[in-house]
A protein has these predicted regions:
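A short acidic, often aromatic-flanked loop/helix-cap motif at beta-alpha or helix-coil junctions
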Residues: 33-34, 116-120, 233-236, 280-281
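Phosphate-binding/switch region of NTP-binding enzymes
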Residues: 166-278
């Protein structure tokens, strides 16, 4: 057994705290060990519940899922809750009208169109130092270093291009995330990445066949990773004479699963209804909103709505065939 010199250990602790500030080294049970995690509500009760009471300040969050699952939609919603937020849509797909639907306002939501991965990361550092409450990067696969982007343009090998993109993104995050984490821990900025699901390169017959771009660094840095999927469409009878579909999709049910959490118990799940014209709502609101939309469509197209449609007790939605 090692010979422990407690007096020397305490002397070292005191010296470190004197040079680096009180609390640089502390023991279990001290006031520094019991610091409360500052959080802000997502405005969605069920989502708050599965992430421990709200989004933590000064942490890295990842929202990932397949295309059309609502990643950007959720990011717009979360940005609208802040006094100021920065959206970095590297994919070039920023939708001002959709951002407004979720409550974002002029001068409250800033948008920076990054050309290359370094642009996005450097602006993230600058705005985080200024203490902006939220930064959203949409999305990880588009975080390509300038040098790698130029190589991709010159390459004709599809597999080589994909490997170049994935490797470049991982290297970029390895370089910048440690600096960003150190800054946001002090300023309280919440950094949210949206990410996609990709087939694993060289995946074996057994085990996970899919993964998310960004490498291990992003996964390690995240305090919360939320997997989202579109479980079902919310529909109403179609009254548009120019549309031959039987029903009109007016929203969807988003399924959220916490696959990693450093600030709460992981693996919690919830489902959230979202309407395209007004954003996220509770399940109690689904039926009244559907009835309202049916009446509006009937007035617009001069169609009568059968009474049984309005009195239907069951919300109408269509399950996704692939279970997403």
């Amino acid at each position: 057994m090692a010979k422990t010199n407690k007096q020397m250990i305490m002397s070292i602790c005191n010296d470190i705290n004197k040079k680096e500030g009180e609390g640089a080294v502390y023991s279990l049970g001290s006031k520094h060990a019991d610091l409360k995690i500052n959080r802000w509500s997502t405005g969605i009760e069920d989502l708050d519940a599965i992430i421990g009471g709200g989004m933590p300040e000064g942490r890295v969050i990842e929202i990932f899922g397949p295309e059309g699952s609502g990643k950007t939609t959720l990011l717009y919603h979360l940005a609208s809750l802040q006094s100021m937020a920065l959206d970095i849509p590297i994919e070039g797909t920023f939708d001002a009208d959709r951002a407004k639907i979720f409550g974002n306002k002029p001068k409250q939501l800033l948008v920076y169109r990054a050309k290359f991965g370094e642009d996005a990361m450097n602006k993230t550092l600058r705005f985080a130092k200024a203490g902006i409450p939220l930064i959203g990067i949409d999305s990880v696969p588009s975080l390509i270093p300038k040098e790698d982007a130029e190589k991709v343009l010159k390459s004709s090998d599809k597999d080589s291009i994909e490997e170049q993109r994935i490797g470049g993104t991982a290297r970029l995050l390895n370089k910048y995330l440690p600096m960003i984490e150190e800054i946001i821990e002090v300023t309280g900025t919440t950094l949210i990445f949206t990410n996609q699901v990709r087939d694993k390169i060289g995946a074996m017959m057994f085990g996970e066949k899919t993964d998310t771009p960004g490498g291990r660094r992003l996964k390690h840095s995240c305090s919360i990773r939320i997997q989202v999927a579109r479980r079902a469409w919310i529909e109403i009878p179609n009254k548009n004479p120019h549309n031959t579909a039987n029903s009109e999709k007016v929203g969807f049910i988003m399924k959220c699963k916490v696959v990693k959490s450093k600030v709460s118990n992981p693996m919690g799940e919830c489902e959230i209804p979202c309407f395209f014209d007004r954003g996220f709502v509770s399940f109690d609101q689904v039926k009244p909103i559907r009835n309202e939309l049916m009446k509006l469509r009937a007035q617009k197209y001069g169609k009568r709505i059968p009474k049984e449609d309005l009195e239907d007790e069951e919300e109408s939605w269509e399950e996704e065939e692939d279970g997403r």
